[in-house]
């Protein structure tokens, strides 16, 4: 917890520009298919009202994962304040085999102790499956809540939780001197802040694997340029500003390289920069357009979009040489892939029959599953644990962000109130 807090502390310098017009998750479908679980309101041991609804945040996290269906508070059979007070039979009668209880205690120095216990109410009734406690200041109460959610999620699923992650995205606001804003928020839309404002378009944010930097495209110089911005101090490093197009940045998983697309010789082609030396080498060539690189876990291979067969399809290439290999065959066209951190599957924009949706492809079998049902879906980005995808779609006259689970069962929206939202990018674990 302490190490994670140190990583997150780097964002505090930007929180002076936290916005009130935040995105919030609105669930559309799929919760009923999740595993039932009980999350009891955390017991508050101080005067007045609790400073944060920790239990509510944990319940929302588990619900937002698409894998759990927390029991509504009005239906809770009891509200125990500790593991010892849990009556397993009352919960198992409702089909619930695990319950989260917790306590929040104020300290004289203004900090808070947050504790939780995950209690088995099924197989081994009354057994504490997981527990932890954290001492945090008020501004870190949501972070402590997400930490508890991560631990509960991992204990019950075997999958590392991703509730302490963030998302970056571009908002085109409704006028003003700087209508384009690169923003970052918690994964659930809270604690939104502005990373960069611009009078010209901003595009394609990409996270460094340690979560400390964002690469993105800016047009502030009158033409496209690739830059890397350090979030802790705002320092900006220009990476590429060649004639014509500079775009689609992607950090390698080992953090040593940045892949991107340039059209300085005519057609779009892929290039890779060694970030330590600044040396750039070309990966693809020819007359076709090659763009939208995404890395495989080995930091040696890229999936990318190419129109070399006529329509856009996804190909794989080794950055050290060799011919690209086509890896998508279903649908009229496929593009803008994002490979999972374990290299087992990818998500992409797949078009067929006039529809453009987010699809998942198994990289071993080639099997494809359409995940989304929204309109003109684009720019999918995977959560670091591979369980969820965030993407943008058209709604009315604008663009909004959407979430879908990688099994396709859970769908939600993150509507913004002050502009169109595009180019979402899910952070690594923070």
From Swiss-Prot:
InterPro entries: 6-blade_b-propeller_TolB-like, PD40, Tol-Pal_TolB, TolB_N
Keyword set, alphabetical order: Cell cycle, Cell division, Periplasm, Signal
Pfam families, per database record: PD40, TolB_N
Subunit text: The Tol-Pal system is composed of five core proteins: the inner membrane proteins TolA, TolQ and TolR, the periplasmic protein TolB and the outer membrane protein Pal. They form a network linking the inner and outer membranes and the peptidoglycan layer.
Signal peptide (UniProt feature, chain positions): 1-21
Record-annotated membrane-spanning stretches: none
GO biological process: cell division; protein import
Subcellular localization: Periplasm
Record-given protein name: Tol-Pal system protein TolB
Recorded family membership: Belongs to the TolB family.
HAMAP family (alphabetical): TolB
Cellular component, GO annotation: periplasmic space
S-S bridge residues: none
Role summary: Part of the Tol-Pal system, which plays a role in outer membrane invagination during cell division and is important for maintaining outer membrane integrity. TolB occupies a key intermediary position in the Tol-Pal system because it communicates directly with both membrane-embedded components, Pal in the outer membrane and TolA in the inner membrane.
């Amino acid at each position: 917890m302490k190490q994670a807090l140190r990583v997150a502390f780097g964002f505090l310098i930007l929180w002076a520009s936290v916005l009130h017009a935040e995105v919030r998750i609105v669930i559309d479908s799929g919760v009923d298919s999740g595993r039932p679980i009980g999350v009891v309101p955390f017991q508050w041991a101080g005067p007045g009202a609790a400073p944060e609804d920790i239990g509510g945040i944990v319940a929302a996290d588990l619900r937002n994962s698409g894998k759990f269906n927390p029991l509504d508070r009005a239906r809770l059979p009891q509200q125990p304040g500790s593991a010892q007070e849990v009556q397993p039979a009352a919960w198992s009668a409702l089909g619930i085999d695990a319950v989260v209880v917790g306590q929040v205690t104020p300290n004289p120095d203004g900090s808070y102790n947050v504790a939780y216990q995950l209690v088995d109410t099924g197989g081994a009734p009354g057994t504490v499956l997981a527990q932890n406690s954290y001492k945090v200041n008020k501004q870190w109460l949501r972070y402590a809540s997400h930490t508890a959610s991560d631990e509960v999620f991992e204990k019950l699923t075997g999958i590392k939780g991703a509730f302490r992650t963030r998302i970056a995205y571009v908002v085109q606001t409704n006028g003003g001197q700087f209508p384009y804003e690169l923003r970052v928020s918690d994964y659930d839309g809270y604690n939104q802040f502005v990373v960069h404002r611009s009078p010209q378009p901003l595009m394609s944010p990409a996270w460094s694997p340690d979560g400390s930097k964002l690469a993105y495209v800016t047009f502030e110089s009158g033409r496209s340029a690739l830059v890397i911005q350090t979030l802790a101090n705002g320092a900006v490093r220009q990476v590429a500003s060649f004639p014509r197009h500079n775009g689609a940045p992607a950090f390698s998983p080992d953090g040593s390289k940045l892949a991107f697309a340039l059209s300085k010789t005519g057609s779009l082609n892929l290039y890779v920069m060694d970030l330590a030396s600044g040396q750039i080498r070309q990966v693809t060539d020819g007359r076709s357009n090659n763009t939208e690189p995404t890395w495989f876990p080995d930091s040696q291979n890229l999936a990318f979009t190419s129109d070399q067969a006529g329509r856009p399809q996804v190909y794989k290439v080794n950055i050290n040489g060799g011919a690209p290999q086509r890896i998508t065959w279903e649908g009229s066209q496929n593009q803008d892939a994002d490979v999972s951190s374990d290299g087992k599957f990818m998500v992409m924009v797949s078009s067929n029959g006039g529809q453009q949706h987010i699809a998942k492809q198994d990289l071993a079998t080639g099997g494809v599953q359409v995940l989304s049902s929204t309109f003109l879906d684009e720019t999918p980005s995977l959560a670091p644990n591979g369980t969820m995808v965030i993407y943008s779609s058209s709604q009315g006259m604008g663009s909004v962000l959407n979430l879908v689970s990688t099994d396709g069962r859970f769908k939600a929206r993150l509507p913004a109130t002050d502009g169109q939202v595009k180019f979402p990018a899910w952070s690594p674990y923070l």
